[in-house]
Swiss-Prot record:
Its main location: periplasm. It comes from Nitrosospira multiformis (strain ATCC 25196 / NCIMB 11849 / C 71). HAMAP family: LolA. Belongs to the LolA family. This is Outer-membrane lipoprotein carrier protein. GO terms for cellular component: periplasmic space. Coiled coil: none annotated. Monomer. Residues 1-22 form the signal peptide.
Length: 207
């Protein structure tokens, strides 16, 4: 099964904050203010509505505000997603195909909109403090618009304010879980990471 673009496109701005906070909402708001660049590894698990595992994947990502990111799936399939600040490029190595979209159209009212760029989180999302479970503080973000692909997003922060887990709950009962490790925050990233030119011979589809 190929990895679904709808899960990839919402995750490029997922970063981490190292500031200590007492609540999930406080950590989320601090993340919005303080996370400028990030490099991290991720493990992804997709669960169906019966909570059976239907897909796993892993890879790495880099991010630089505003709107620049590089998201690499290494297993089970090679896929590359690059945001250059204006467009998002999806490159599927096996299919020899590139899909390109405008950044605003691709993100919309989504988890990326929740985490990207400005601090006006509650303009587009209802935030609910879930509380401490184990050593993780959880916050729930629900889109105010009915046009969102996702019903809700759960964000889990450590007690030190580091974002470790994100769960995307879609409108069909499917859940995509991302767990993050090897976080490097606010380091200078090479500009070339956020540029993409389609390889020769691949099909390019504009949406």
């Amino acid at each position: 099964m190929k990895l679904s673009e709808k899960f990839c496109v919402f995750l490029f701005f997922l970063l981490f904050t190292s500031t200590t906070h007492a609540t999930g909402i406080g950590s989320l708001k601090s993340f919005m203010e303080n996370a400028r660049t990030v490099r991290a590894d991720f493990a992804q698990t997709v669960l169906d509505k019966s909570r059976h595992i239907v897909q796993t994947a892993s890879g790495a990502m880099q991010f630089e505000r505003p709107g620049k990111f590089r998201w690499i799936y290494e297993k089970p399939y090679e896929q590359l997603i690059v945001g250059d600040g204006e467009r998002i490029w999806f490159y599927d190595h096996d299919l020899a195909q590139v899909t390109v979209r405008k950044l605003d159209a691709a993100i919309g009212s989504s988890p990326a909109a929740l985490l990207a760029g400005n601090n006006d989180i509650e303009k587009n999302f209802h935030l609910l403090e879930i509380g401490l479970q184990g050593n993780i503080e959880w916050v729930e973000a629900t889109p105010k618009t009915r046009e969102s692909t996702f019903e809700r997003v759960l964000l889990g922060f450590t007690l030190e304010g580091i974002l470790r887990v994100m769960e995307l709950h879609d409108n069909f009962g499917q859940v995509t879980v991302f767990e993050f490790s090897g976080v490097e925050q606010n380091r200078k990233l090479p500009p070339e990471l956020f540029k993409f030119s389609p390889p020769a011979g691949v099909d390019v589809i504009s949406e």
